[in-house]
């Protein structure tokens, strides 16, 4: 449908033109006001408090400007021109006006809650935040603030449901939730366990938290409640085991690591795990498996070519003088304190040229003191040869390292060249 007018007189045309100008000016003014209020309300734009107050006075019906002013006051909590109480009251008034102007905006309800808490009105703070949660029930940030407010006001029981919701929706917040509840309840583990939810990996987060409190038995129990499949997949598993090791909890670390690695189709009850290099190391889970690192003197890799199995450790020298190997190949063991053990392995050199070949050594895990070592790998024949080490585990240090060790006797030695294969490491009690 088309509507048209015929303006025959000059007066009517002038009147119409004037009305159009007024309408355009009004629309332009509205757009200008919208632009200015959006700029003033932008949190990324640095505007001092005085200017915000002037803007709020000039645009009294702008919810955005009112909210920005209230937010600024809540954040600063300090104004040289007025007391804390007066500032809190003013912030509350502006936040309340923002809610009145835009009642469907949950963020303004959150702001009103903060302003109410700032002036000591806990009931209004809780009421406003509950309304925000009603408007945005799936907003994790709102639920997190609800949980914190309830905890601050002593409503621990009510806060647990909120903390649990947040932990399930955003697992990254679980460590903070555990810390807050730990402090609020004086370390009541029964309370902390109620926020873990159904995610098995939450048990690993909980276990890591407990290691930080030096509650290693409780941490081990929490760790064990997470099924093996999830443990093998989660990077948290390695962090928990590392925390046990860092605290010298060798026995717990060994027990939990073996329980994790001994899946239904892969069991290894030997004192020295993976002695024949048949199991592929898992990233982050090599605490009691082989640690291999190249250096400037040699490269180490597990590949096909084993003595009794499919694979072996290949050590290839780079032909650099004064060759030194200390921790490039090592394996952590937890053993019985004071007990005597015999370590054996096989080595096969290929075109090995050296002043003195490497040895198999057993060192303390804490001080790296050498407890015993084998004879050097012989260059006499390119065949598998047996290396053996007898040693006693220190009573005060049940954790030891098996290493491939080559220390030059002099400040300069001729380059070591060639390759050595290592395989079939075994450990037995004497």
Give residue ranges: language-model regions:
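Short coil/turn linking the two alpha-helices of tandem helical-hairpin repeats
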Residues: 29-44, 70-82, 118-121, 154, ...
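TPR alpha-solenoid repeat register
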Residues: 65, 108, 142, 173-177, ...
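Residue at a conserved register position within TPR or TPR-like alpha-solenoid repeats
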Residues: 73, 116, 150, 180-181, ...
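Extracellular and organelle-lumenal recognition/adhesion modules and their flexible linkers in secreted
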Residues: 13-34, 38, 172, 194-430
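Short coil turns that delineate tetratricopeptide repeat
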Residues: 57-61, 103, 137, 168-172, ...
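Canonical positions in the second alpha-helix
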Residues: 54-55, 97-98, 131-132, 166, ...
């Amino acid at each position: 449908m088309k509507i048209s007018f015929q303006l025959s007189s000059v007066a009517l045309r002038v009147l119409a033109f004037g009305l159009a100008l007024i309408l355009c000016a009004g629309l332009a003014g509205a757009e200008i006001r919208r632009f200015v209020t959006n700029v003033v309300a932008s949190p990324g734009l640095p505007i001092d408090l005085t200017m915000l107050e002037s803007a709020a006075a000039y645009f009294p019906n702008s919810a955005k400007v009112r909210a920005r002013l209230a937010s600024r006051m809540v954040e600063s909590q300090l104004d040289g021109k007025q007391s804390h109480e007066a500032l809190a009251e003013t912030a509350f008034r502006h936040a309340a006006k923002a809610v009145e102007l835009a009642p469907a905006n949950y963020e303004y309800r959150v702001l009103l809650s903060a302003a109410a808490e700032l002036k000591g009105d806990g009931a209004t703070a809780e009421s406003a935040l509950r309304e925000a949660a009603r408007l945005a029930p799936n907003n994790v940030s709102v639920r997190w603030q609800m949980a914190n407010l309830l905890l601050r006001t002593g409503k621990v029981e009510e806060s647990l449901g909120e903390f649990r919701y947040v932990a399930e929706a955003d697992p990254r917040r679980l460590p903070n939730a555990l810390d807050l509840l730990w402090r609020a309840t004086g370390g009541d583990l029964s309370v902390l366990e109620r926020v873990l939810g159904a995610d098995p990996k939450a048990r690993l987060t909980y276990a890591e938290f407990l290691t930080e409190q030096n509650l290693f038995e409780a941490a081990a129990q929490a760790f064990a409640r997470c099924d093996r499949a999830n443990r093998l997949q989660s990077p948290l598993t390695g962090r928990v085991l590392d925390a046990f090791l860092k605290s010298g909890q060798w026995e717990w670390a060994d027990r939990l690591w073996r329980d994790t690695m001994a899946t239904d189709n892969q069991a290894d009850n030997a004192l020295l795990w993976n002695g024949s290099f048949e199991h592929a190391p898992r990233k982050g889970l090599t605490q009691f498996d082989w640690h291999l690192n190249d250096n400037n003197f040699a490269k180490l890799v597990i590949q096909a070519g084993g003595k009794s199995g499919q694979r072996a450790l290949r050590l290839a020298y780079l032909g650099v003088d004064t060759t030194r190997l200390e921790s490039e190949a090592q394996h952590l063991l937890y053993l019985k304190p004071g007990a005597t053990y015999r370590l054996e392995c096989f080595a096969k050199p290929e075109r090995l040229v050296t002043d003195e070949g490497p040895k198999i050594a057993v060192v303390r895990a804490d001080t790296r003191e050498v407890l015993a070592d084998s004879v050097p790998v012989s260059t006499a024949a390119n065949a598998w040869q047996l290396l053996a080490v007898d040693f006693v585990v220190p009573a005060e240090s049940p954790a030891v390292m098996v290493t491939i060790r080559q220390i030059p006797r002099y400040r300069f030695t001729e380059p070591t060249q060639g390759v050595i294969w290592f395989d079939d490491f075994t450990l037995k009690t004497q």
